[in-house]
Each structure stands twice: as C-alpha cells, then as structure tokens.
C-alpha cells in the first residue's frame, strides 16, 4: 500500500519534525521544496534511527565549519550540546524541551557533541539541515551517515586537528 499524506498547512520557514508510529514496518520520507531568488532545490528527508546510543555517551559530529540547523524529536528532550570552535574554544548549553528542538549551530563550529541528561527520554530521531545560497541538504542522525549532497568547505590548517 502506498499512501501520500499531504502536509499542506503553513509549517513556517523553519525546520519541523514528523514522528510516525506503526505496528508494521514502513518506509517514509518527506519531500521539501526550497526556493530563493537565484535557484530552486529540493530534498528528500529520510527517517533517522532512534538515538539510543545517547544513553551510552555523546553523539559527536565533526562539522568542519558548516553551520547546520540541528533538529531533535522526542517526548522529553533533555540534552547538553557542546561545541568546539575553530580556535579550540569549548561552549555548551542545556536544553529542556518537549516534542521538538531546533537549534542553529554557531558559526565556525568545528565539532559538536550531544549528550542526553539522566532526565531525558531516548530521542526518537534527529537531523542536520543546511539551507543557503547554494541549496538545501539534509543529513539524518544515523550511524555511518555521510554528508555528500552539499558543498563542503575548503579546510585550512587551522581547522585540522
């Protein structure tokens, strides 16, 4: 059975999360169309796996200067997000949210770590989204995911560690 569910309502300009529960296996994705003054682009957002690995420690991502929007979905999001900039300065912030968290990664972030606090529930899923002058890209938080659909920055010696 193939079914299309239209999300025609005004979802705003930002990211959003869709949580699907089923008693059988299913395949799902979200088609997003993006248009700016100079181009048109689209992305198929695929599901991310449940982020149970957060229970065993942080999820760490090497961003190399990219500035995505991080989106997390869970009934009870209670996480500490730490990041290291290209100069080696470490910063962190704690989030206590329900259902959906959207956070813009600061400029010049080299590495990002997400750690669940003891009060937080397992994450239902998460993703990184990039929107900019050259298009849109989506990367689900899945073990082994590799971003290969967006332009990667040219690294210099200061970002290599």
Which role fits each region the language model picked out?
Residues 1-17, 85-113, 117-118:
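Intrinsically disordered, low-complexity Pro/Gly/Ser/Thr-rich segments with frequent PxxP/GP/PP motifs
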Residues 17, 69, 80:
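Conserved beta-strand and immediately adjacent loop positions that scaffold enzyme active sites
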Residues 25-76, 94-99, 106, 120-161:
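Conserved functional hotspot residues at active sites or interaction interfaces
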Residues 78-85:
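Beta-strand-rich binding/interaction modules
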């Amino acid at each position: 059975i193939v079914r299309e569910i239209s999300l025609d309502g005004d979802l705003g300009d930002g990211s959003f999360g869709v949580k699907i529960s089923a008693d059988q296996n299913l395949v799902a994705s979200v088609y997003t169309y993006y248009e700016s003054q100079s181009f048109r682009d689209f992305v198929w957002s695929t599901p991310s796996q449940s982020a149970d690995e957060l229970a065993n420690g942080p999820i760490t991502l090497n961003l190399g200067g990219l500035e995505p929007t991080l989106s997390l979905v869970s009934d009870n999001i209670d996480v500490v997000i730490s990041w290291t900039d290209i100069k080696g300065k470490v910063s962190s912030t704690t989030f206590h949210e329900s259902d959906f968290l959207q956070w813009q990664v600061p400029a010049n972030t080299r590495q990002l770590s997400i750690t669940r606090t003891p009060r937080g529930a397992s994450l239902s899923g998460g993703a990184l989204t990039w929107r900019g002058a050259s298009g849109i890209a989506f990367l689900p938080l899945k073990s082994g995911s590799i971003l290969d659909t967006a332009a990667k920055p040219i690294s210099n010696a200061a970002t290599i560690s």
